[in-house]
């Protein structure tokens, strides 16, 4: 059983035991269960939910109103919906949990959700945590930060550009002017690296000159900006001018000042359409809450509170773990939105659509309206006279069927918090303004990816047909003018997209007892040799490569350099260079192994096991003097490291060194006998770290060995070698 599943089962048992004894579980336990359920849904990797702060040692049992849990309703497939699975007017658990048995700290009385204190806490979290939000696994990020999704987005954008070059929708491009690709909420910069790299590699087949593309990383925090500016992998792109950066608040700012070029982007400054990328952003921007009940739209007001009696710092990000939110609903006028820079009729059109849709069934509807995302997109699209391409991936819904029923919104807590993005509303907004949307119809998906296009031609937006299936018909008619975009979206998102890749690697890691090396190589190729995937399956690779057929070894050797070229330093606990060094040692390419051990020492820091493994490389190459130096360096960092002591004695004996004061001294000649085995790893990967001689693998039926060594193990590692 997967680790995350075991954790949920154990936590659930604790919860059930408490209930059996008439004791209500604490908000901390509720938050932990909610986070683990997110892990089961695929929204967090086990390493990511395990990277947050540990649960408190002492748990206070607190009564909550009505004994309700803080979990959202889930369908039979386990997919999380966008709303809490109960109706709670006036009071609700819209966060980690609520507490009625002790005083609730009211941070804010009932107010419109988009103007509430909730979003100030969100800004405070990312401002204070900075890049640590991703590097320490506080916020899940692998699903949107890997080589596969970077390549997928680049292919979709390329399809859009190909259509524009052919004049689709009147969206002509000027190849002499820059094409700005603006990423909102860049965060760590890892996705930016992958997408820009993929675009540059498409130079020979892209219909628009790649050298005129400028990728712009933006975020509102100074710490993130500084991290990008100092990241060595990004420096070549910055120096070439194809990458630029800016501090930009997507909620409030109206212009973007590029730090490298000094260009000021604002209304009417872009000749070519603006291209926008937004992953895991829209779920963190302000939303409004609506319900449609008995043919009337109502707004949801929220009172933000904490289960803790007092909160001296109302912007303390830790409050997110103690959220105790209440909801109330009231009727709204027809002109609810009155100050939206011309978008008032479009917002009204969308709300009217939901009222009409709800009237076709019973039970009403509950809607999160992504007003923050729509405002941010509206401002950006003025840069290019309302001609834009947008691609976004997030946890959300694009099917209005998911909004049926009267329920309070579910707020998922995972270090920070997020809500389900209403991609249907965003698509309706673009359609209302003369554009169109492409949605992935897949229901079971942790990451929903949608693409939106605005052509600058609002003609026809006043034809009066905006309810029922009228919007879908407009989408189909307009998107048909962009056949290459449709084809690229279908291939790279619908047929097998970023969510599918995430599910595949996750299942192979958690559900397969021992994946074969051949299947791991296939996964690596599918994921463009993503370094995180390599790191996840490093044990499989190292344990099976010695018995692999020559063809499979060659496939790995061709791909490993790609792993390194795709490496974006973020989490120093994932020392990819060190693991690549171990791989090369395992196939007896000692010079390559040494190169990556040196890279590991330079990028992550010196480690006694790294020096020990370098000593083994030099020993295997017959350079006993360098082997001796590295074993001594290992012992200098860790005098109690027994393996280095053993190898140091062995080297001294082979050098015929007389002992001085009980220690050998260096002289003598080198042995040409290679060191047997594989090098040490830094982190134990199994209860027993001792190496066992692998059983020779039988060749597949019908496949002949390329050489006498095929299917046979390399010489076994020394018994004193285990993990770092």
Identify the function of each model-found stretch.
Residues 2, 9-55, 72, 78-178, ...:
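N-terminal charged/capping segments associated with class I S-adenosyl-L-methionine
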Residues 206-207, 212-219:
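Conserved SAM-binding motif I beta-strand of class I
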Residues 226-268, 347:
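S-adenosyl-L-methionine
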Residues 260-294, 363-371:
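A short SAM/SAH-binding and catalytic strip from SAM-dependent methyltransferases
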Residues 278-341, 411, 415:
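A mobile, often basic/glycine-rich helix-loop segment
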Residues 348, 352-602, 606-612, 616, ...:
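Rossmann-like AdoMet/SAM-dependent catalytic core
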Residues 606-610, 636-649, 659-660, 677:
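Boundary/linker segments of alpha-helical solenoid repeat arrays
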């Amino acid at each position: 059983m997967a680790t995350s599943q075991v954790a949920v089962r154990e936590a659930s048992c604790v919860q059930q035991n408490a209930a059996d004894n008439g004791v209500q579980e604490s908000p901390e336990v509720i938050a932990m269960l909610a986070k683990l359920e997110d892990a089961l849904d695929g929204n967090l990797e086990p390493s990511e939910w395990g990277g947050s702060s540990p649960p408190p040692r002492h748990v206070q049992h607190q009564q909550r109103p009505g004994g309700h849990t803080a979990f959202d309703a889930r369908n039979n497939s386990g997919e999380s919906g966008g709303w809490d699975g109960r109706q709670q007017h006036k009071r609700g658990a819209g966060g980690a949990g609520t507490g009625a048995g002790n005083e609730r700290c009211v941070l804010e009385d009932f107010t419109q959700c988009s103007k509430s204190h909730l979003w100030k806490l969100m800004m405070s979290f990312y401002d204070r945590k900075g890049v640590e939000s991703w590097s320490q696994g506080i916020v899940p990020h692998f699903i949107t930060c890997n080589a596969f999704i970077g390549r997928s987005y680049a292919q979709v954008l390329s399809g859009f550009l190909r259509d524009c070059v052919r004049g689709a929708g009147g969206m002509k491009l000027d190849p002499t002017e820059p094409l700005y690709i603006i990423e909102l909420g860049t965060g760590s910069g890892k996705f930016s690296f992958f997408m820009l790299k993929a675009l540059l590699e498409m130079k020979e087949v892209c219909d628009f000159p790649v050298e005129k593309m400028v990728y712009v990383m933006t975020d509102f925090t100074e710490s993130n900006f500084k991290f990008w500016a100092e990241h060595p992998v990004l420096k070549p792109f910055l120096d070439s001018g194809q990458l630029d950066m800016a501090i930009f608040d997507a909620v409030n700012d109206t212009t973007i000042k590029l730090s490298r070029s000094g260009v000021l982007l604002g209304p009417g400054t872009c000749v070519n359409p603006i291209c926008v990328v937004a992953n895991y952003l829209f779920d963190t921007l302000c939303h409004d809450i609506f319900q449609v009940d008995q043919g009337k739209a109502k707004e949801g007001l929220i009172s933000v509170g904490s289960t803790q009696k007092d909160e001296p710092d109302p912007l303390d990000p830790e409050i997110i773990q103690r959220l105790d939110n209440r909801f109330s609903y009231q009727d709204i006028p027809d002109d609810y939105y009155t100050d939206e820079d011309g978008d008032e009729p479009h917002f009204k059109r969308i709300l009217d659509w939901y009222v009409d849709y709800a009237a076709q069934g019973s039970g009403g509807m509950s809607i999160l309206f992504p007003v923050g995302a729509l405002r941010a997109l509206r401002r950006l699209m003025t840069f290019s006279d309302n001609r834009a391409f947008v691609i976004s991936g997030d946890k959300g819904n694009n099917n209005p069927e998911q909004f049926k029923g009267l329920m309070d919104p579910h707020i998922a807590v995972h270090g920070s918090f997020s809500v389900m993005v209403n991609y249907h509303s965003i698509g309706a907004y673009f359609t209302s303004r003369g554009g169109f949307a492409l949605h992935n119809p897949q229901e079971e998906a942790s990451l929903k990816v949608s693409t939106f296009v605005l052509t600058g031609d609002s003609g026809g937006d006043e034809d009066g047909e905006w309810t029922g299936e009228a919007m879908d018909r407009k989408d189909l008619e307009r998107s048909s003018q962009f056949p290459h975009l449709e084809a690229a979206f279908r291939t790279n998102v619908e047929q097998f997209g970023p969510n599918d890749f995430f599910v595949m690697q996750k299942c192979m890691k958690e559900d397969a007892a021992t994946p074969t090396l051949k299947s791991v190589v296939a996964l690596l190729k599918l994921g463009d040799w993503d370094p995180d995937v390599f790191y996840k399956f490093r044990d499989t690779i190292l344990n099976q490569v010695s018995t692999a057929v020559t063809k499979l070894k060659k496939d790995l050797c061709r791909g490993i350099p790609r792993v390194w070229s795709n490496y974006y330093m973020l989490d120093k606990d994932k020392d990819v260079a060190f693991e690549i060094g171990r791989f090369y040692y395992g196939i007896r390419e000692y010079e390559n192994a040494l190169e990556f051990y040196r890279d590991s020492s330079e990028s992550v820091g010196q480690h006694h096991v790294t020096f020990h493994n370098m000593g083994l490389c030099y020993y295997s190459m017959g350079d006993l003097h360098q082997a001796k130096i590295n074993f001594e360096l290992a012992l200098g960092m860790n005098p109690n490291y027994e393996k280095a002591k053993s190898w140091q004695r062995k080297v001294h004996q082979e050098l015929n060194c007389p002992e001085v004061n009980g220690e050998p001294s260096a002289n003598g000649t080198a042995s040409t006998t290679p060191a047997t085995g594989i090098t040490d790893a830094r982190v134990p990967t199994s209860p027993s770290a001792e190496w066992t001689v692998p059983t020779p693998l039988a060749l597949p039926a019908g496949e002949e060995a390329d050489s006498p060594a095929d299917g046979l193990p390399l010489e076994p590692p020394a018994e004193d070698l285990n993990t770092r």
